[in-house]
């Protein structure tokens, strides 16, 4: 029986918005300009980036050529290949070069337990309607190399799998029961009409290759691990996840399984469900570009079967949303306005006048000398209006009512997420980045850690729910974070903001330290960095802690409030506010 990974647990949050919803997405030119007697002021909901600034992966389709000629498998290993009709079987360790057109056939590896096999794709097309076109039944490790300056394709033409389908003939277009490595400087197009695109039951690694994977379910899956070192990868999932691991156990050497590791490359992920779904963790470091579009932000998404009380129920989907969205008008109060008789950030009083620092060039003010930027000065009158982008898909003014009973997050891990590099762009109808701490969720029987750590990198998120959500703890030590749109920008029980530049736009709370396990007292702790928070009209807070707020450094700017002249709490706490440094 086949397990369809597109079946998702119910993970829809019940959220109600009380204002006109903004976009969850990647709109071009979403900086708002308002005009009043005091002149023109630019209010930024984060620093919106033009989509033309996004670096996308090179598409393997750009190198497509017609594959002709007889199919051949050559090797210097004698008696290493057998042929039965259109099925070619590699039985020994060695290097095998594949060329030509194989229609309705298979390339199978069935070697010894200790054998390492290298398959060189040297201009080939393999199509099969009865099993995985490339099927590794047994070996120690298989390396598939796309030869430089060649175009290659693998097409699984089987009818889409069901719950009763067998995986005896392979569960993906390229399917391996052992470690699988994709390498080479050529191009490879993989189409998985049956279930997954590329899958290893152990570790899957990708280096250098230009690869485009389109699958009805998961595009790229390594049960134990996925490791992307370099290359250009486009992963498209019509009904599942883009990049996925599923095993969170420990290896025989006590190494943690279930981690997606990305250290280089240009990667585009289009997924109906999660962009990256890790059974344990996600580690991203180094230089590269990662773009993720989920649910209605992926033009490739189709109807998804959801689990819950009715596992067989199909959830209808609206047409996919364009990455650029239309704008709704939202009223708000500029940070530089003088508000009288309005509740202040700490439980009453006026919001002082002054001018917000100029950030029109997208740069935070210089605080290298330890001093906060000068905000003295007067402002004109109240400023309202301005365009805010509109929500995608089936979001509407009643709240986050997408109706999905499956997860559509950008990056999701059952335990921890660590980011130390990369330029990341996420457009998701669910949380942009999410770490779980569910009880006993790991195969070791342990709870997930529920932690997110940002050490460096540039992250831009447009989310229909939370920008970043950690069940336990969120640490930002450095880097650039731009939550262009969200319901709540940053959310965790413990939020430590130690450095970097952080821009947040939220329709509810910008930064929220929430209750959770009943053991940890929620806290927002600011020790450094530049934090710019904008919230929409209504009952919203720039910073909301269900426990305490502590600031010993950094610069915090909160903009938000109401078109009627009232502003919600800049900082709203259930505990205490302690400020001994910073601004």
Language-model segments: which ranges?
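A composition-driven surface/loop motif
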Residues: 2, 9-583
């Amino acid at each position: 029986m086949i397990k369809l990974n597109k079946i998702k647990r119910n993970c829809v949050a019940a959220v109600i918005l009380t204002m006109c919803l903004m976009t969850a997405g990647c709109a071009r030119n979403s900086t708002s300009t308002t005009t009043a007697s005091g002149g023109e002021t630019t209010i930024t909901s984060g620093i919106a980036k033009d989509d033309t600034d996004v670096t996308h992966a090179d598409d393997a389709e750009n190198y497509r050529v017609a594959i002709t000629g007889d199919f051949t498998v050559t090797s210097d290993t004698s008696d290493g290949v057998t042929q039965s009709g259109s099925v070619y079987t590699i039985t020994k360790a060695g290097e095998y070069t594949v060329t030509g057109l194989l229609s309705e056939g298979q390339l199978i590896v069935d070697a010894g337990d200790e054998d390492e096999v290298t398959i060189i794709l040297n201009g080939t097309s393999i199509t099969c309607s009865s099993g995985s076109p490339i099927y590794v039944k047994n070996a120690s490790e298989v390396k598939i190399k796309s030869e430089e300056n060649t175009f290659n394709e693998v097409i699984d033409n089987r009818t889409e799998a069901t719950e009763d389908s067998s995986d005896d003939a392979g569960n993906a277009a390229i399917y391996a029961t052992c470690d699988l490595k994709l390498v080479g400087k050529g191009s490879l197009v993989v189409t998985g009409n049956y279930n997954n695109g590329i899958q290893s039951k152990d570790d899957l690694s990708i280096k250098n290759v230009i690869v485009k994977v389109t699958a009805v379910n998961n595009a790229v899956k390594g049960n134990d691990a996925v490791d992307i070192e370099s290359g250009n990868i486009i992963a498209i999932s019509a009904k599942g996840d883009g990049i996925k691991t599923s095993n969170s156990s420990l290896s025989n050497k006590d190494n943690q399984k279930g981690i997606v590791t990305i250290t280089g490359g240009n990667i585009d992920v289009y997924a109906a469900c999660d962009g990256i779904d890790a059974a344990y963790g996600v580690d991203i470091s180094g230089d590269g570009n990662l773009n993720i579009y989920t649910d209605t932000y992926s033009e490739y998404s189709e109807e998804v079967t959801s689990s819950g009380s009715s596992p067989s129920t199909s959830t209808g989907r609206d047409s996919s949303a364009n990455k650029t969205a239309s704008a709704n008008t939202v009223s708000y109060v500029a940070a530089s306005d003088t508000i009288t008789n309005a509740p202040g950030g700490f439980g009453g009083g006026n919001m002082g006048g002054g001018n917000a620092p100029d950030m029109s060039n997208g740069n935070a003010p210089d605080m290298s000398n330890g001093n906060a930027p000068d905000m003295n000065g007067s402002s004109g009158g109240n400023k309202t209006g301005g365009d805010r982008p509109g929500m995608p898909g089936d979001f509407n003014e009643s709240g986050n009512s997408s109706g999905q009973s499956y997860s559509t997050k950008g990056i999701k891990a059952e335990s921890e997420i660590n980011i130390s590099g990369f330029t990341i762009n996420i457009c998701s109808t669910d949380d942009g980045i999410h770490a779980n701490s569910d009880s006993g969720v790991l195969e070791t029987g342990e709870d997930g850690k529920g932690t997110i750590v940002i050490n460096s990198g540039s992250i831009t998120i447009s989310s229909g729910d939370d920008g970043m959500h950690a069940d336990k703890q969120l640490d930002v030590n450095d880097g650039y974070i731009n939550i262009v749109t969200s319901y709540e920008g940053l959310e965790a029980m413990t939020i430590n903001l130690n450095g970097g530049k952080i821009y947040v736009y939220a329709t509810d709370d910008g930064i929220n330290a929430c209750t959770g396990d009943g053991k940890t007292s929620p806290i927002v702790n600011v020790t450094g960095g530049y934090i710019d928070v904008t919230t929409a009209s209504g009952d919203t807070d720039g910073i909301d802690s269900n426990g305490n707020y502590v600031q010993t450094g950094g610069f915090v700017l909160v903009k938000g409030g109401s078109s009627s002249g009232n502003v919600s709490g800049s900082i709203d706490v259930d505990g205490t506010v302690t400020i001994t440094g910073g601004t």
